[in-house]
């Protein structure tokens, strides 16, 4: 089978890249070892985070770091055995999270977020996926006035600097919005601009069907089997040999299975996360996507039930599941909302692919003329899928990307 482009990885990033190339007339083969959207993209909190112009930094407060070191929290957990391996990544993550550097990174990151809703909207229309989208923002609920007031000030800054819309909620207003939520919260914050997704895997599959309607082909195979040819690239798949002029690495946390073999070294880390679905107790309903701000877990009312998602687990990518955060979160969540029984046989786990400077790698590989990268989107893979696909496709076709790619180039890591 011959194609113009092979896209390695069929998560939301890879599918979005494939769609954007196919929309521009390229013949594309999309490859994954599993079905589309069945890895990291399957289990997120279902938010297209238009408010997320400031990437999640590494804590700088010594007291907070000391509390994290106790390893008993919901928002962060670590495997002690993995610390020596991940320490270089964490050190650079901490370095890039220092205030001045973090502010500069946020300025470079913001254009991606600013295009997130617009680009999703185009694909949602073409994929006829409107039934999966809720255009009602999401909420943060606060246990303390200190955290509430700090986040209110942060929201005011985002409104001033970026036009991000928000609504401050009193205790009573939060109770009116979520009548079955605990009355222990002192208030809330509603981010009005983001969209929510009732079934993140369903949205990836809707984009996948759009890709196939544009003439694209999906095949299963091992991305590590990629090799160069005089005219480009080839890979053996379960459906036979595929050859193409160009290849895109969109493998998320598994990008190194290809990049390392081709001579590129990226200091990447993963933030593993877990979810479980629950039925609400009879006669109750959760109306909004909601985070328990001081505890760091998320409740999302999805098609499959109320999805509880955890914060970050710092561990080896391939280590066995250790859903201690999920069980901690469930115990706390049951005190603030009447969750019913578990709806999943076991916890789901995924791995967010993270760079130390919190920005994805998007663009051309430095030492291969027809190799392209699109990975490292951390918490915002779902949010940034379509805009990543667009700017990469524009660059591959020799067009001027709507957002300059320089801030996201691989060269910043000297790989």
Tell where the protein language model's regions lie, with residue ranges.
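N-terminal Rossmann-like FAD-binding beta1-loop-alpha1 element of flavoenzymes
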Residues: 3-30
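Glycine-rich FAD pyrophosphate-binding loop
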Residues: 23-43
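Active-site substrate-recognition segment that forms the wall
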Residues: 44-47, 52, 56-96, 225-233, ...
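Rossmann-like flavin
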Residues: 87-209
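C-terminal catalytic lobe of FAD-dependent flavoproteins
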Residues: 162, 293-294, 334-415
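A conserved short coil-to-beta-strand element within the FAD-binding core of flavoproteins
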Residues: 169-177, 217-233
